[in-house]
Amino acid sequence: MPSSREIKRRIRSVKNVAQITRAMEMVSASKMRRAQRNVLATRPYADRMREVMANLTARVVGAARRGTLLEKRETVKSVALLVVTPDRGLCGSLVANVLRRAGRFITEQRAMGRTVDVYTFGRKGRDFFLRTGFAPAGEATRLGDAPKLEAILGVAISAINGFQSGKYDELYIIYSEFINTLVQRPAIKQLLPVESPDISTTTNVDYTYEPGEEEVLNSILPRYVETQIYQAVLESIASEHSARMVAMRNATNNAKDLVRDLTLSFNKARQAAITKEVSEIASGAAALTS
C-alpha cells in the first residue's frame, strides 16, 4: 500500500490537474458561445445565397450548364476531398470521428477505381495524413477561433480550379456538424458539381439578372461553393469548442472522483499507521512491565 506521503502528493497533483481542466472548460464555453454566434451570423447570407442559386439553376438548364460548376461528368475518375479538423486536441473523439469517416470515404472511392486528393483545414488532419504517407494537395492551418473568409480561400480556390480544369470530377467536404452542445457528428457533403438547392424551401421571387442569367450564374457559383466551405469551417470550430468543453468537464469530474478515492486511501493509510504506532507503544509498555 502506498505511504501517506505518496498519496498526499498524488492528491495535490490531481487537484492541480482539476484546476487546469476546469479553467479549460470555462474558456471553451466562452469560445463556444462566440463560435455559435459566428455560425448564426452567416446563416442569413447563406440562406439568401441558396435562394438565388435555386432560382438561377432552375432557369439555366441543358447545354448552358456545360463548362460550369454545375456540369456532371459522365465518368468519375478523380475526386478531391476537403477535410476540416481542429488545430488542437483535447476535444474528445471529435477528431477521430472525422478522420475515421474520411478514411472510410477514401477507401470507398478507391474501391470504385477513383483517385483521391486530400485538402486539409486544421493541423490535426494535416498531421494525420502526413503520418499515413498521404501528403495533402493543399492545407490551411492556424485559422483561429473566428477565421475570415480570406483565410480559407487559398485552399478553396485551388480545389475549385482543379474541378474547372478537369483534374477532379467531384469535390466533397468532411467536417464536424454542430448539432448542439452535446452532439457533434461527422458530415460529408458534395460541393462540386453543385447540386441545385431545394426550391420548395425558398420564397417565390421573380428575379431579374443583369447582364444575363448565365453570366450571373458563372460569377456566383464559385462564391456559393466558397460560402459552403466557410460555413463548414465555422461549424467545425463550434463543434470543437463544444466537444472540448464537455471533455474538460468530464475530466474535472473524474479528477474529483479520484481525489475522493485517494482521500479515502489516505485516511486508511494514516489510520493503519496510527494503529501500528499505538500497537508498538503498547507492546513496548508491556515488555517494560514484564
Curated annotation (Swiss-Prot):
UniProt xrefs under Gene3D superfamilies: 3.40.1380.10, ATP synthase, gamma subunit, helix hairpin domain
Per the record, the coiled-coil ranges are none
Database matches in SUPFAM superfamilies: ATP synthase (F1-ATPase), gamma subunit
Q: List the disulfide bonds.
A: none
One annotated GO biological process: proton motive force-driven ATP synthesis
According to the UniProt record, one GO cellular component term is: plasma membrane
Which terms in the Gene Ontology molecular function aspect does this entry carry? ATP binding; proton-transporting ATP synthase activity, rotational mechanism
> What PROSITE patterns does this protein's entry cite?
ATPASE_GAMMA
Pfam families with a match to the protein in the record: ATP-synt
Asked if Membrane is a keyword of the record, the answer is yes
Name the family the entry cites.
Belongs to the ATPase gamma chain family.
The record's function comment reads:
Produces ATP from ADP in the presence of a proton gradient across the membrane. The gamma chain is believed to be important in regulating ATPase activity and the flow of protons through the CF(0) complex.
**What PANTHER family does the database record attribute to this sequence?**
ATP SYNTHASE GAMMA CHAIN, ATP SYNTHASE SUBUNIT GAMMA, MITOCHONDRIAL
Quaternary context: F-type ATPases have 2 components, CF(1) - the catalytic core - and CF(0) - the membrane proton channel. CF(1) has five subunits: alpha(3), beta(3), gamma(1), delta(1), epsilon(1). CF(0) has three main subunits: a, b and c.
Q: What is this protein called?
A: ATP synthase gamma chain
Q: Which gene encodes it?
A: atpG
